[in-house]
Amino acid sequence: EDGPTHQPIEQFAMLRSIPNMHVIRPGDAVEMAAAWKLAIESKENPTALILTRQNVETMAGSSVEGVSKGAYIIGKEEKQCDAIIIASGSEVNLAMNAKTELLKKGIDVRVVSMPCQEIFDQQDKAYKQSVLPNDVRKRLSVEMASSFGWHKYVGLDGIVMSIDEFGRSAPANQVIESFGFTVDKVVENVEKLVK
């Protein structure tokens, strides 16, 4: 199936490095509608919509308003926030599935959908703190692309799940699994953080 030329891991980082560019990676149909609205209403910023070819479910908690702020809590912790998983695009669903498994193990996480880093960075400090509070330093980012740019959100104590090597030739599901983008691997990484 798809080989390395269809796995452009550097493209998100390259697009995000363009001044004033908004790179939006929606995770489902609700986020896509919000992203489209932002793109057509934008008069100052060029916008790149990064979409998946995968079938993705509409997620409970998806928010048009959240997308307009660049990032938002799509999966709130039950009681206390042991860790935060930050994801974009189709990986948000992966993060939500991992949240369910982690809760079974007694680990209570928050899931943040971050479709647009640039818009989130423009929010006021209070909003950013409400989504990514400073006192929760156990953070994991999940994006099937270069790690470039994610360290500022996870900090020195966090883990970045990314792809920092050339792609592979195989059916999509095999490639995804070989790079570790599975519920089990997300759970394992969160467990490393909270120990």
Give, region by region, the residue ranges found by the protein language model.
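Thiamine diphosphate
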Residues: E1-P8, E41-K195
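Internal gly/pro-rich beta-alpha loop/helix module
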Residues: E1-I18, A29-V30, A34-I40
